[in-house]
Structure formats: C-alpha cells, structure tokens
Design a protein with these regions (language model features):
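Entry/capping segment at the start of metal-dependent catalytic domains
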Residues: 1-30
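Active-site-proximal helix-loop-helix substrate-binding element of RNase H-like nuclease domains
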Residues: 30-32, 36-37, 41-149
Length: 149
C-alpha cells in the first residue's frame, strides 16, 4: 500500500463551524460514523462504524505509517478526527508529514474550497450528491427538539 484516500463522516454535539476542529473532536460524544477509503486508487470501501463494523488493521496501521501517503479533502480535519479515533491523548495528533490535502491543492489552482464546488467547476462525472448533504446534516449534527422529533 502506497496511497490511502480517506473520507469520514462524524458526529459531535459541538458546532464545528463555530468552535473549530479541535473542540469538535474533544467533545465526549464525538464519534466517527462512517470511514470511507480507497487503497492505491482501487475501489472505494465504506466501513459503517456506527453499526459496529471495524476498520481493517492494515488500514489503521497505515494512518501512522510515514511510508503511506494519505489523501483527503480537508486533510487536517480527517487527521485530527482519526487521531482521536485511534486513541491518541488530547493534544497529540497523527504526524501531518505524510498527509496531502486535495482541498489545498484545489485552492492553489483557484478552485472552490468545497468538494461540491470543485466537482461542479471541473464538470466531474461523479458529483457530490445533494441528498448526501441533507443526510449528513440529519445524522451528523445535533438538532433542536421540536414536536416532530
């Protein structure tokens, strides 16, 4: 394994946009719900952690293996979240040296800073699903109680 592409979906009662990544991850109820990955450009795999599935041991080992290049859109967020997931103490994080951020690469080319925006500008065949955004909001963000819920 030389390259590991990663995408996670997570939950925390802390508002990410108001509080930032570190406070979001430090919340006692923080959890990674879904872990999507691809090894060396192969087929994408999704591990449903919320339903008890486990990330393969070789993939967990690759997270801290400097010989494996990790790719993610907003890699800093994924790296900090995964640091907590693998049990590093608060304030200690996976070394960023072998991580590459496709959001930063997009920004250097003048592309939008959202995955949805990059896909639209580049007219990619596979776009981020708008339905997915609604589902992420429903499952990954706390909601205020209403009569309906």
């Amino acid at each position: 394994m030389r390259n590991l592409s990663i995408d996670i979906e997570s939950f925390s009662s802390i508002n990410l946009s108001k509080s930032g990544c570190y406070r979001y991850v430090e919340s006692p109820d923080f959890e990674i719900l879904l872990f999507g990955y691809s090894l060396d450009g192969g087929a994408a795999q999704v591990v449903d952690l919320a339903c008890g599935e486990k990330i393969p041991a070789d993939v967990i080992a690759a997270l801290t293996d400097e010989a494996v290049t990790k790719w993610a859109f907003n890699a800093s967020f994924e790296r900090v979240c995964l640091s907590r997931f693998i049990g590093l103490p608060t304030g200690e994080y996976i070394d960023p040296a072998s991580w590459h951020c496709s959001m930063v690469w997009a920004a250097t080319m003048g592309l939008p800073l959202s995955l949805e925006g990059v896909g639209a500008v580049l007219k990619l065949d596979k776009q981020k699903l708008t339905e997915g955004k609604d589902l992420i909001k429903y499952f990954c963000q706390p909601c205020a109680p209403t009569k309906a819920n």
